[in-house]
Design a protein with these regions (language model features):
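Conserved small/polar residues in nucleotide/adenosyl-binding loops
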Residues: 122-128
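N-terminal export/assembly segments and adjacent metallocofactor-ligating motifs
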Residues: 1-91, 107
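N-terminal leader/propeptide and maturation segments of large enzyme subunits in energy/redox metabolism
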Residues: 92-121
Length: 132
């Protein structure tokens, strides 16, 4: 996110060119970041899975394999539900978490309050949330 402050892609931490799945959340790289937009298009050509989470239709939607349109203001609840699934189903890199994170057990406890079925106020169905 540091590139959002400096405006320079050189400080960003994303690695779109090597990603198998790219998550674009509430952002329009077509207008906001031409370099990131080009990387997103390369990822698409490579066959990467592109998921857009945004209530607005942006150019990225036309290149996405999945477009989620949550009710505005509910994106944090959606993120918590997604983390709930990842942690509950152990779909994360345990070694990475052990070595590089702090507070993971607290996060795991917190997301228990956000099972996907409990965040219907996002206006997304349970099957849609689970597809991500």
């Amino acid at each position: 996110m540091s590139d959002m402050v400096t405006g320079l892609g050189i400080t960003g931490g994303e690695d779109i060119d090597n990603a198998e799945c790219v998550l674009v959340v509430g952002r329009n790289p077509y207008d906001a970041d031409p370099i990131q937009w080009m990387a997103l298009r390369r990822a698409e050509k490579r066959g990467a899975n592109i998921i857009v989470i945004d209530p607005r239709r942006t150019p990225a939607v036309d290149h996405a394999s999945l477009w989620l349109r949550p009710k505005p203001g509910t994106d944090a609840a959606l993120a918590m539900a997604m983390m709930h699934v990842l942690i509950e189903e152990e779909r994360y890199d345990h070694a990475f978490v052990e070595r590089w994170t702090h507070g993971f057990s607290e996060l795991a406890e917190r997301v228990k309050s956000y099972p996907p079925a409990a965040v219907s106020y996002t206006h997304l169905t349970l099957p849609t949330i689970l597809r991500v």
